[in-house]
Structures are given as C-alpha cells and as structure tokens.
Amino acid sequence: MLKGSITALVTPFDREGAFDEKAFRAFVNWQIEEGTKGLVPVGTTGETPTLSHDEHKRVIEVCIEVAAGRVPVIAGAGSNNTVEAIELAQHAEKAGADAVLVVTPYYNKPNQRGLYEHFSRVARSISIPLVIYNIPGRSIIDMTPETMGALVRDCKNIVGVKDATGKIERVSEQRAICGKEFIQLSGEDATALGFNAHGGVGCISVTSNIAPRLCAEFQEACQAGNFAKALELQDRLMPLHKALFLEPNPSGPKYALSRLGRIENVLRSPMVTIEAATAEKIDHAMKHAVLIN
C-alpha cells in the first residue's frame, strides 16, 4: 500500500497568511494526476508547528476528501507529548486517513525506552497503520534498529519507517531486524537511489512537491530494478534536491511552487522567504530538470 513517490505536502497560505484551502485542493489533485502514489499532509514540510490544532485537522480532512481513495493519505500525527500525539492520531483515523506518520519526540530527548513507550502507546490507541519518522537531524534523537524491531514485534500496526538518518546501511540493518515486509521509505530525496537499492520501497519526498511526475518515474524505475533509468532521472533531479534545501524547508519548495503558479510564496514566522541568490539557484535547478524554460 505504501510505496513509490509519496509527497510530503506543503500547506499553502494566502497573502494574509491563512490556510489557502482552494489552492490546496487544486494542489492535491495535481499531485495525484501527475503520478504521486501517496500524500503526507501536516508534516515538517507542511509547517505543522505553526498550524493551530484546528488548522492541522482541517488540512488532513481536505486532503482525504480530495484524494477520495485514489492514493493513500498518511497523516502527520507527531508530537513530543504522547497524549497529544494520541489525540492527533485518533483524529486522523476518524477523518479517514489510511495511516499516520509519527515523528520521534523532539526537544525533550527521550531515551530508547521512552521512544518505545511513546510509539507503543500511540500505536495501541488506533487501528490504522503507523509509520515511524526517524529524523535525528531535527529531533536530536535516533531510534535504534533494535528499538524499532521491538516495536514492530509488539505492535502489529507499526508497519514501516520514514528514515531520514542519511545512513544507507540502516535499510539493511532494519530489514534484518524488522523483517522483509517492513516498509522502509527514504526521508531524503538525494539518497533515495541508494536507499532503494538496499531494500527501500519508496520515498516521502519534498522534491515531488515541485516535480511529482519525475519523482514518480524515478521511484517506478527503482522498483522495477531499472537503476540505469533511475540514475538518469536522479541526474536530472539532483540539482533540485540540493537547491531546495539551501535554506530551511519549506522555504525553497514554496518559492519553486510559486514559480509554477501553484501557490503563493507565503510562510509563517519564524520561517521566512528565501534570499534572491537562493532563488536564482532554484531557478537554475528547475531549468535543469526542464520544469521551467
């Protein structure tokens, strides 16, 4: 169910900074029409830290409504407060999400036992699948393959991981401990080729916000074992993978989407729009990928 190119969706805002529901509806539909195989609303790229709880829930509800069962919706339900994560996960299930994505708790830095407690409690509070989001670069903590294996063993609805460790060897380690059926999705566009070669089955992608068709074709080539074609597409996409992260995400993707006429280039403080020099580099990368003239 969860494989291929899955987009970590931006949340469009209008010029007054409010959630732009009309733009979001069109954006979600465009993603599906371009070949995206799954959608992740209200993750990091969706600026969830600056959404109110009501906005967070509304974004999920709209995404599910527009997707209409065409592709799975993996709703963001992360928090560094277990009770809050449970509440968000339960709302996502009630709204009709196909799965939830739960990030490792940030800032308060639980140990491995604390991670087990957090994820097992969230998983047992819902009946839909849960995907672990392991991103040490943002949360400071790193869930070990052993902790992941214990969670998979004890919680049958913990089905996969979005791995943003940047450690390609983790795919093989987690495959050995969690089993071959455990869904491993790359959390980094730039390393997705190697990730898939090690046994990954897709990517929760930022770049696919801007280049959904290319990212979908790249993942399809990987899953078909056609790594020559995948490498060709990777070469076309790599400058964009890099340029979009020259400044903190999602400032780059929002600028690029505004260049495509999809959304307004508006972020919520403390996120700010990109510098002119960064915009020039993103433009160049978009031209390299043949997304603009």
Swiss-Prot record:
The encoding gene: dapA
Positions of the catalytic residues: 133, 162
Family membership noted in the UniProt record: Belongs to the DapA family.
Domain of life, per lineage: Bacteria
Cellular localisation: Cytoplasm
The protein, known as: 4-hydroxy-tetrahydrodipicolinate synthase
Chief subcellular location: cytoplasm
Protein EC: 4.3.3.7
Pathway: Amino-acid biosynthesis; L-lysine biosynthesis via DAP pathway; (S)-tetrahydrodipicolinate from L-aspartate: step 3/4
Organism name: Brucella ovis (strain ATCC 25840 / 63/290 / NCTC 10512)
Site residues, Part of a proton relay during catalysis: 44, 107
Recorded catalytic activity of this chain's protein: L-aspartate 4-semialdehyde + pyruvate = (2S,4S)-4-hydroxy-2,3,4,5-tetrahydrodipicolinate + H2O + H(+)
A GO CC term attached to the entry: cytosol
SMART domains: DHDPS
Molecular function per GO: 4-hydroxy-tetrahydrodipicolinate synthase activity
Residues involved in pyruvate binding: 45, 204
Gene3D superfamilies xrefs: Aldolase class I
Subunit structure: Homotetramer; dimer of dimers.
Annotated InterPro entries: Aldolase_TIM, DapA, DapA-like, Schiff_base-form_aldolases_AS
UniProt record, GO biological process: diaminopimelate biosynthetic process; lysine biosynthetic process via diaminopimelate
Pfam families reported for this sequence: DHDPS (PF00701)
Function statement: Catalyzes the condensation of (S)-aspartate-beta-semialdehyde [(S)-ASA] and pyruvate to 4-hydroxy-tetrahydrodipicolinate (HTPA).
Annotated keywords: Amino-acid biosynthesis, Cytoplasm, Diaminopimelate biosynthesis, Lyase, Lysine biosynthesis, Schiff base
